[in-house]
Regions:
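Central antiparallel beta-sheet cores of small beta-barrel/beta-sandwich binding domains
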Residues: 4-117
Length: 117
């Protein structure tokens, strides 16, 4: 998993629940490095996060669980410096990603493709 995610670019869109009349908004995540941590199911992803007015690179210690052979990036009340507290479930399959996200009282869906340089 660490090798697959290192150098991966997640490029896609996100929606905001309750705003179905609006088009999805663009998002991009570049994982420059992913390394397995000693704790079970834990990985450190050094990621550049771009959405809205945000463009920042941060280290994220995240749990990656497995649904059979499918990895699911898992965040529960996870604080990201300069961005806030988030929850998410992001499923990875066949060089695509999809999932749900939550930021305080606001949430929605996210989806896109995973590209490697």
């Amino acid at each position: 998993m660490a090798k697959y995610l290192s150098g991966a670019n997640f490029v896609g869109n996100f929606t905001i629940e309750g705003q179905s009349d609006k088009l999805p908004k663009p998002e991009a995540y570049t994982i420059s490095k992913c390394e397995k941590l000693p704790q079970p199911d834990m990985y450190r992803l050094t990621a550049r996060i771009k959405y809205g007015d945000i463009d920042s690179e941060v280290p994220l210690d995240l749990k990656i669980l497995w649904a059979g052979g499918t990895p699911v990036i898992t965040m529960d009340a996870f604080w990201i410096p300069g961005m806030g507290t988030f929850g998410a479930r992001v499923l990875i399959h066949a060089n695509r990603y999809s999932g749900t996200w939550q930021h305080d009282e606001v949430g929605g869906h996210l989806f896109g493709v995973i590209k490697k340089d």
